[in-house]
Amino acid sequence: MARETEFNDKSPSSTDDGMSQSHFSDKLKNLFHFRRNRAATVSTSVRNDQRDNDSDDSTFDINVNQLNELDLNDSSDQLDSRPSLRRVSSAPDSHKGVEAPPPRPLINMSNIRKAQVKILKNPGNYIFGRTEYGKRTYSGNSTKISRVEVTPHSFEKIRLLGQGDVGKVYLVRQKSNHRLFAMKILNKREMIKRHKVNRVLAEQEILTKSKHPFIVTLYHSFQSRDYLYLCMEYCAGGEFFRALHSLPKHILPEKDACFYAAEVTAALEYLHLMGFIYRDLKPENILLHQSGHIMLSDFDLSKPISIVTHPTVVLPKHSTFSQEKPALDTNSYFSNFRTNSFVGTEEYIAPEVIRSCGHTVAVDWWTLGIFIYEILYGTTPFKGKNRHATFSNILYSDVSFPEYHGAPNVSSTCKSLIRRLLVKDESKRCGSVAGASDIKQHPFFRHIQWALLRSMKPPIIPKIEDGMEAVEPSDNDNEEEDFLNSQYLISANLPAVDMHSSTPVNEQSNPFDSFSSVTLHHAGDE
């Protein structure tokens, strides 16, 4: 949940959750002034995370049509007078004027005694949602959805894993079987206030439908009067971001970067085939399973399409790269589909998003290029001294690669893929012809056996003793309010609305009516 930055171009007439761009611009036009007349502005907001506890929900007007090199030295640029958006991989808290905290160790056995965790003779059989990676079949009929079988009282809270502006994530243990889960608890009042109801509904839809080894698994979802609960697989390896920053220079050798890029590509391909644009790829949103394989998480910025078409096949002669077999066209699902939402992470945002001209599934391939660059070089390619400069670089600067003495050794083949993924024109970007098939056919992945990714040994294996990560109880007694003291909705048969409102319940609309309270059984987990 670290370094989480969100931009929102909100339009009441669109299917995305939020307010109109012009409304924000009119309301905030006196806050910031640039020397030049602006042709167009976009609104941005800061989404806080566990390392940014400011509750400031500030918005900004920033010029995207007149960014140029002269603007980078413009002393009238007032953006830096506001809280900086998070996106400095080496110092995520630099905007606060404090030293970035060191990466949390993957294992700290001294804290286990604090948690008073009972380690049984064979803890792997009961601690994790999956006892052995790859045991699940992921077949189309491997998931059984039934009426929810748990309540908040079915779990014991161990500690707080992270928090955002509308909720928290806890490490919990199910009392009946001692299995560990990550439970996301979202405050309904805050979601309504911040116009994020549709986002959690989209996230639940993705988690409920997904059956993929590189996407985090949902086991239970339910709600109380005041909160929504998503009980998901606990990835004991933690954030990929933290694992990366525990390495020398915070980088990976090219061979290892290729492995993780391949797993991310496979996960994105699956999401696209399911009709979802991810839109927020970054190391913080990638978790490490205890086996070392990756799992994508945090789908609240993802965009589902309303109508999913049948897939098509691209013949070899039409493919971007030479290949022996026809390629499955994952782009065909998004034919004639564009969305105007302004969402993402500052240094990962694609040019078409900044220009507010609408975007397609191609934004995911842009973020893949940024991701590969970052894990190879320890920084992102277009990062500027401030947000204004970063956006200018994204729009107008070509990607460059460090060539100083001691710079990471990266092959021309790898650089070729990064350049192809970071083409400004989305219609010419790698992936524009057949989607994921284009990326998978690039020579950079020539040694990857895509069907056997789950069987490959990951470069980073989390050091977890006795099946446990460092676990310790939280010292904040107020956290019990959202965990146990909420009135359980299903058993009490209460409406999913704000019970504290002065408006009678029968007159309130129910924005959470489509939030499904279900339990999912996965073949291979029992």
UniProtKB/Swiss-Prot annotation:
The Polar residues compositionally biased stretches are: 10-23, 500-519
Location, primary (coarse class):
cytoplasm
| Tree of life domain | Eukaryota
Q: A single GO BP annotation from the record?
A: phospholipid translocation
- Stretches for region Disordered: 1-24, 39-106, 499-526
Q: Which SUPFAM superfamilies match?
A: Protein kinase-like (PK-like)
The record lists the organism as: Schizosaccharomyces pombe (strain 972 / ATCC 24843) (Fission yeast)
Every Protein kinase domain range: 155-445
Identify the InterPro entries for this entry.
AGC-kinase_C, Kinase-like_dom_sf, Prot_kinase_dom, Ser/Thr_kinase_AS
Per the Swiss-Prot or TrEMBL record, the active site comprises: D280
Residue span, AGC-kinase C-terminal domain:
446-526
Q: What is this protein called?
A: Serine/threonine-protein kinase ppk22
Phosphothreonine modifications at: T339
Using the record for this protein, list the coiled-coil segments as residue ranges, or answer none.
none
Listed under catalytic activity are: L-seryl-[protein] + ATP = O-phospho-L-seryl-[protein] + ADP + H(+); L-threonyl-[protein] + ATP = O-phospho-L-threonyl-[protein] + ADP + H(+)
Keywords of this entry:
ATP-binding, Cytoplasm, Kinase, Nucleotide-binding, Phosphoprotein, Serine/threonine-protein kinase, Transferase
Q: Name the encoding gene, please.
A: ppk22
Enzyme Commission identifier(s):
2.7.11.1
